[in-house]
């Protein structure tokens, strides 16, 4: 086993280790301010990423710095607080010990907020050949791939090769898929004519595929139709009830026997929770999520919690767990703050009750679909609304 991290114990304080600085982990670290706890935040990156806008980085709409927030700047005035950039590798629950890439760390409470990664459903070929969109590195890779495709298309005299370079297939018709399709449609309309005047914008194809019968299956049918109509007006080709069988030699094979000839495939068809070694197999549920009780605790270990995308809390209203979006992560973090404080004062814990404030997906610069509990609407200034829905 590796040597211990150089973080001294603080007398009279319980050590709370938070693995992951996403929306849930960051909210917990920022808002739990108590002399009863020494907080250690662990993350693979030295900054928080505002993931909902990664698609704009990928399509050259904004720079990575606009959605990256350094942890050391956020917490520079905090006392009893430590940050370590590392990868959590294995937990030893019987010893209250966490092993990381830079050493071991003892804990009194452990919060697993490791989020999700792209799910390729066991297809290694798709993982190697397609573009994902879960972090800044992937977004920048995608941006370079898109722009390089335009450059190559401008230089080639081969019509078939140019068609492959100018065809962009997006697999997954959820929020990320429709946002990416809308952003690419805007690139075709506004960027290509100015930056690549020698290219024929009509040769650029944007194809959005989904395995279900409609886009945005988490939204109402009315919202799904509104989004589909909007994208079609922007010449986005929509193919529903289509499953990808494989991708080889620039041929994206579909279950109906057809194939799309393209060098640009974005894979945003699903996610799976990031796992942590050392926990028993029965601690995990569908999608690699950790099964938790109504207090976000792992049933076998009362001092280990999971929040956000990695937590599977089953209820009558949410038999498959809460949606893997920002709101549940932030709300679970808030409830966990209260419960950690209550636990230290001997008070009973309070169960988590999810308050759905609504959902939103943006499609281009000034268009979005929004569903609140009592009303749904479209055609609004998207960015003015998004901050309210994720807070």
Question: Where are the language model's segments positioned?
Answer:
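Beta1-alpha1 glycine-rich phosphate/pyrophosphate-binding loop at the start
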Residues: 2-82, 89, 175-218, 266
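FAD-binding core/adjacent interface of flavoenzyme oxidoreductases
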Residues: 2-15, 81-169, 266
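A Rossmann-like FAD-binding core segment of flavoenzymes
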Residues: 79-90, 185-294, 300
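Short glycine-rich anion-binding loops that position phosphate/pyrophosphate groups of nucleotides
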Residues: 115-118, 181, 271-273
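FAD-site-proximal beta/loop scaffold in flavoenzymes
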Residues: 129-158, 251-253, 259-331
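A conserved FAD-binding loop/helix module that cradles the flavin
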Residues: 313-354, 360
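Conserved small/polar residues in nucleotide/adenosyl-binding loops
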Residues: 378-385
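Hydrophobic alpha-helical segments, chiefly the membrane-spanning helices
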Residues: 390-391
């Amino acid at each position: 086993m590796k040597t211990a991290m150089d973080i001294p114990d603080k007398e009279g304080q319980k050590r709370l280790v938070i693995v992951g600085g996403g929306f849930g982990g960051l909210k917990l670290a920022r808002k739990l301010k108590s002399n009863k706890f020494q907080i250690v935040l662990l993350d693979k990156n030295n900054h928080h990423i505002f993931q909902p806008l990664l698609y704009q980085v990928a399509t050259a709409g904004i720079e990575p710095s606009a959605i990256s927030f350094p942890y050391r700047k956020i917490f520079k005035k905090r006392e009893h607080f430590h940050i370590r950039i590392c990868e959590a590798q294995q937990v030893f629950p019987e010893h209250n010990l966490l092993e990381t890439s830079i050493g071991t760390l003892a804990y009194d409470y452990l919060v697993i907020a490791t989020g999700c990664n792209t799910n390729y459903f066991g297809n290694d070929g798709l993982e190697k050949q397609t573009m994902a969109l879960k972090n800044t590195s992937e977004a920048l890779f995608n941006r370079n791939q898109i722009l390089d495709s335009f450059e190559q298309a401008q230089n080639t005299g081969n019509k078939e090769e140019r068609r492959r370079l100018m065809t962009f297939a997006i697999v997954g018709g959820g929020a990320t898929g429709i946002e990416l399709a809308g952003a690419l449609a805007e690139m075709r309309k506004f960027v290509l004519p100015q930056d690549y005047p020698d290219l024929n914008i009509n040769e650029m194809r944007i194809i959005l595929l989904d395995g279900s019968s409609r886009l945005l299956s988490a939204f109402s049918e009315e919202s799904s139709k509104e989004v589909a109509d909007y994208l079609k007006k922007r010449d986005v080709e929509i193919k529903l009830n289509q499953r990808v069988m494989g991708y080889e030699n620039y041929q994206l094979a579909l279950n109906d026997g057809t194939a799309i000839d393209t060098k640009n495939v974005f894979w945003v068809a699903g996610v799976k929770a990031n796992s942590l070694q050392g926990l028993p197999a029965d601690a995990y549920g569908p999608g690699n999520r950790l099964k938790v009780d109504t207090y976000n605790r792992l049933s076998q270990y009362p001092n280990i919690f999971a929040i956000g995308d990695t937590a599977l809390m089953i209820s009558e209203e949410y038999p498959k767990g809460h949606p893997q979006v920002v709101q549940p992560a932030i709300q679970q973090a808030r409830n966990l703050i209260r419960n950690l404080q209550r636990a230290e004062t001997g008070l009973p814990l309070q169960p988590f009750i999810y308050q759905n404030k609504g959902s939103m997906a943006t499609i281009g610069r000034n268009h979005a679909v929004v569903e609140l509990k009592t009303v749904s609407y479209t055609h609004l200034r998207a960015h003015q609304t998004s901050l309210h829905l994720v807070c």
